Amino acid sequence: MTVQPQTLKIRRPDDWHIHLRDDEMLSTVLPYTSEVFARAIVMPNLTPPITTVASAIAYRERILAAIPAGHKFTPLMTCYLTNTLDVNELTRGFEQGVFTAAKLYPANATTNSTHGVSDIPAIYPLFEQMQKIGMPLLIHGEVTDAAVDIFDREARFIDQILEPIRRQFPELKIVFEHITTKDAADYVLAGNPFLGATITPQHLMFNRNHMLVGGIRPHLFCLPILKRSTHQDALRQAVASGSDRFFLGTDSAPHTKHRKESSCGCAGVFNAPSALPAYASVFEEMNALQHLEAFCSLNGPRFYGLPVNEDFVELVRVPFQQPEEISLGNESIIPFLAGQTINWSVKA
């Protein structure tokens, strides 16, 4: 019988995809990330979106001001690509160290993406410059054609959009974000070292049956949407393989309770409070704890060309129960796995 480890010591992880929002929401959710993660790629889909160096600097300052005392955390800012973005602004932001990467949202693919790109080949000059200067492109990989079934939008994106981009710009660093399908996992595994992918805890732990059978569970609704179990299994196999193409990106995306539990609920899962223990539980189930540190702490920095973190965090086999909800002024946020117990805790 295999003896289960009681503690796991790994280099401090980074979150390569997060939504921190702004104002009171920012100050409420940020500590759950800054307590555990050293760095995070911060999504730019505010209202209005982050499209200039000045707006990115201002947002970064608001984030830094919200970090609790004693937390060491660095927000890595991103530029929201639009049909009319100035290539010089993009270049200046990257060369000044303000923008770590640029984010491609196909128009209307997800929350606050109405300003996204409606004609992707039209912004190929931006991709050409990004390839030249070594700036990573982060992609929400779904087509938005209303005629395409929501469960097929990621797979269709690979053929219609991602493959042509990669053929045209073979040395452009691309992160295929929050992948949800076997198609995407296989595509990344078959790709070259310029292609990586993030995977969320919810897509590793759940499939669409969990969201839809026995009643609709709106707090599992995110985009890209949870897929069938065969896709979930493929994602689990991908992270358990130890491939360095995959790394941690929670896509933690908080919304207030009433915006989730409504007749037209928002997409997004607020998983920051439980993310690292949730990932550990998946890797343990897959008998792959030996690959947890690389997924959480090594693969991402190496893809981005950044140093790995020097300090460590410890996970201990002490069950902890997620709160049912988290206060936000007069409202609340329902966290991922609300009220449920996870077998791992991050040691304070």
UniProtKB/Swiss-Prot annotation:
Pfam families reported for this sequence? Amidohydro_1
Which cofactors, by name? Zn(2+)
Q: What does the cofactor section's free text say about binding?
A: Binds 2 Zn(2+) ions per subunit.
Q: Name one GO molecular function term.
A: dihydroorotase activity
Q: Which reaction does it catalyse?
A: (S)-dihydroorotate + H2O = N-carbamoyl-L-aspartate + H(+)
Q: Which residues form the active site?
A: D251
Q: Does the keyword Cell inner membrane apply?
A: no
PROSITE patterns, per the entry: DIHYDROOROTASE_2
Task: Please tell me where substrate binds in this chain.
Answer: H19, L20, R21, N45, H140, L223, H255, A267
Tell me which residues bear N6-carboxylysine: K103
GO CC, alphabetical: cytosol
Enzyme category, top tier: hydrolase
Positions annotated to bind Zn(2+) 1: H17, H19, K103, D251
Q: What is its EC number?
A: 3.5.2.3
Q: Which SUPFAM superfamilies match?
A: Metallo-dependent hydrolases (SSF51556)
Question: What pathway does the UniProt record associate with this protein?
Answer: Pyrimidine metabolism; UMP biosynthesis via de novo pathway; (S)-dihydroorotate from bicarbonate: step 3/3
GO BP terms: namely:
'de novo' pyrimidine nucleobase biosynthetic process; 'de novo' UMP biosynthetic process
Record-linked NCBIfam families? pyrC_dimer
Q: How does it assemble?
A: Homodimer.
What family is this?
A: Belongs to the metallo-dependent hydrolases superfamily. DHOase family. Class II DHOase subfamily.
Q: What is this protein called?
A: Dihydroorotase
Taxonomic lineage:
Bacteria, Pseudomonadati, Pseudomonadota, Gammaproteobacteria, Enterobacterales
Q: Which gene encodes it?
A: pyrC
